[in-house]
Structure formats: C-alpha cells, structure tokens
Amino acid sequence: DYGYDHTKLRETEGRLFGNAWLENNFSQSQVKLRLDNWHLGKMSSWAETPKNITHPEIKFPIDSNLYLGYGPLTRNKETKKTTFKDKLNAAIRAEESNLLKIIHSDQSSSAIHKALQLIHWFGTIGGRSRNGWGSLLLEGCKLGGQELLNQSNSMLKELAKPLNEGFKFDWPHAFAMDDNGLLIWKSNKPHNTWREAMVELAKIKIAFRTQPHLVFSINKDAAVPKIDYRHLLSYPVTHHGVEGWCDK
C-alpha cells in the first residue's frame, strides 16, 4: 500500500500508535496494550545441555543454544560449560505465559489482526527475536494455525515480491518469492519443545553458512580482516572480523 516507502510507513505508524512529530497530525495512540502482569524473568541460571551439534570449522562438539545464543549465553573457559553472561537480568522461562489485551479502533482492526497472525505464524517480533531466542506463541483472536502457512495463502502473497526486486532495498521489507512460490523455510517435522527446535535450527544454520561457496577464502588471517562472502549473510562472524567493523 505504501510502495515500500519507509517514510510513508513511519507516518502511518505514527498516526496509529501516536506521535509528536507529524506537524499537522500529531495524536495519541489509537492502540492500547495491557499485559496481565509485568513479572520479571525467573530463570537466573542456564541448565547445561548436551553438546549436540558439530561444526566443520570447530574442532569439538558444541551446544546448539550457545551457537545461537549470540549474547545471553557464553562458554565458561574454566568449566567448559554454557552459562549466562555476567550481570544479565533473569530471563523468561520457555513455558511461561501472559495475557495481552489490545484495544483498538474498528478501522485498524484488519491491520492489527494481520500483524497478530504473522507474529503467531513466525513466532517472532522484530529485532527482539533472533536465532530462535525471544520466540513466542499467541493463542486466541481467531488466529489461523500452521496449516494455513502455505504457498496459496493470499495474505502472504500480498506481502511478497519477486526475489530479485527485493534486493533493490537495503532493509527487510517483504517475503520473497520465485517461480515456484513463496520462499519460506519450514522444518520437515514439528518439535515438542523449544530446545528441540533450537537444535534443528542450529544444524540448518551451520549447513547453510558453511556451503562450499561461503567457505572463507579471502578472510583467513585474523590480522588481515577482509570482507568475504559469508559476511553478506550476517555480521559479526567469530574470528573473522572486517577492517573498520571489528570494534563496532
């Protein structure tokens, strides 16, 4: 609706959630959110899990949670165990739940429902969810199940564009699609727990990042931090910094 113009998106967001910067259209939020409780997380220590995955560039088996942990977790060099980083606030346990109430105008009902449906399908909310951490599941609001997350889904098609066109923008803005349909990854089987899903996600990510054409061929010396193909997927990469980026 907005031609993927981030300025128009920001203005629309400002009118919906309130703003003090739209010169002739500053307003209060049309949406109100209320949580049933604001309890702090209760998990202050990390239960050791098996070192259940292998990485072709690492000499020893590793813990999938540590591999995907990017920040909350670290490896204690003395005990060789996965632990929370120092001074980290207690985290929310995987099995915890809360009640979210949303009050909104009738005119924003469709947009709110679509947003909730996408959150439910993909289990994620923006940058707060990464590598499976921060994942969540919504119940209620007449949300469709995973069986509707398929190539023929009209709502997903509305939010998709051809893969090559997507590269014209330098920010994530749409689902990609090719001649075969939507480019959405799904695991071959469901998992009973978050930890089981994290093992599968770690294996997939390692396999994807270590494909032959993404093996480091330029950035081999830590003293000469040059950009390589794998950096196009994500940054930082452990032991493979890029000059000018290393300290950022």
Show which residues each predicted segment covers.
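Basic, Gly/Ser/Thr-rich N-terminal segments that form RNA-phosphate-binding interfaces in CRISPR RAMP
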Residues: D1-K248
